[in-house]
A protein has these predicted regions:
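Signature of exported/secreted
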Residues: 21-330
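Bacterial Sec-dependent N-terminal signal peptides
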Residues: 1-26
């Protein structure tokens, strides 16, 4: 049970037009100034580290190149971006198989992003028809799980996969990956202030949310007339994690372990949880080009820490996006 609890904490830890400029009143505003047909290319890398006691090892890694193309531009309504994966490498065979299956049937398009005139994200959508092949995707991932875990009964994964691979969750995964790149668009920030905020992180298993609190600010020393460097940090403590974690674990157990003693599982979980120490911390550092509003560099890091019965563990996830230099100027 300790392994299940630690694993889930890590999973849960995994959703007006004009040129932006430095203002004369010591503020900075991030605004999209995109034109129809504009296209930027980004190199991305994501690495997940597992921590057990004092040991840290690479659990999985992904990398590739994506493009973001403006396919609709309206000064009053906003913009639509098409996000496409041009190259992709996955160390996880299941993720690789899923990506290959989606690319085979739907091409390179990952999702579409609709924004307001400032570049503030309004909604995400996935390629038409992707949600209709849910059962095919579930079967493909189930087959990959059979190969990776030959000693396990593959049917135990099916309820979990049916919860995970849905049109809503495919949109949520795209939202979690790409929305932070544009989270500061539309904001006008003073150079000398830190802004406090609260964020309610939704669950994909229940209707619950997890509250995280933190602050963001402009790094004045690294900001000039060409670009702005923005930073954010947010955390969730044990009391904020408790209802979120417990409700989600119960949902997973009820779906994946129907033949097991539910009362005993719940009792064991409560005992472990009462003594557990846990925390989640997110950090974001982003550089945005002021003249166009395109992100130049982006770093996301999530630290998950867990101590159960003196056994320490956790996970670090680090994701970066870097604009390909020769494509910065349109």
């Amino acid at each position: 049970m300790k392994k299940i609890l630690l694993l889930f904490v890590c999973l849960a830890a995994n959703l007006l037009p004009g040129r932006a400029q430095m203002m004369p009143d010591s503020t900075v505003q991030v605004v999209a100034y995109w034109k129809l047909g504009d296209k930027q290319y980004y190199r991305y890398e994501s690495t997940q580290f597992k921590i057990k006691q004092q040991d840290t090892v690479v659990a999985k890694r992904s990398a590739g190149i994506i493009s973001m193309e403006v396919i609709s531009a309206d000064e009053e309504k906003g913009y639509r971006l098409k996000v496409s994966t041009l190259e992709s490498q996955e160390s996880d065979p299941i993720a690789e198989a899923l990506n290959e299956q989606i690319a085979k049937n739907f091409g390179a398009e990952d999702c579409y992003i609709d924004t307001d005139p400032y570049g503030t994200i309004q909604q995400f959508s996935i390629p038409e028809g992707l949600g209709e092949c849910q059962e095919d995707l579930i079967k493909m991932v189930s087959d990959a799980l059979k190969q990776k875990y030959p000693d396990e009964n593959p049917d135990i994964f099916l309820p979990f996969l049916r919860q995970m691979i849905t049109p809503e969750n495919l949109v949520a995964m795209a939202t979690n990956l790409y929305s932070p790149l544009f989270m500061f668009h539309g904001a006008r920030l003073a150079l000398s202030e830190k802004y406090e905020f609260e964020d309610n992180v939704p669950s994909i298993f229940t209707d619950g949310t997890m509250k995280m609190s933190g602050y963001f600010w402009v790094n004045e020393e690294a900001t000039d007339e060409e670009s702005v460097l923005l930073q954010l940090t947010k955390t969730a403590d044990k009391e904020e994690l408790k209802p979120f974690l417990f409700n989600n674990l119960n949902a997973i157990i009820q779906n994946m372990a129907k033949d097991m003693d539910q009362e005993t599982l719940t009792s064991d979980l409560e005992k472990l949880y009462d003594t557990a120490k846990m925390s989640i911390t997110d950090q974001i550092v982003e550089v945005v080009h002021l003249d166009t509003g395109w992100p130049i560099e982006y770093l996301f890091r999530r630290d998950v820490e867990m101590v159960i019965s003196d056994e320490a563990g956790g996970q670090i996830t680090q994701t970066t996006f870097s604009i390909i230099p020769q494509e910065v100027e349109q």
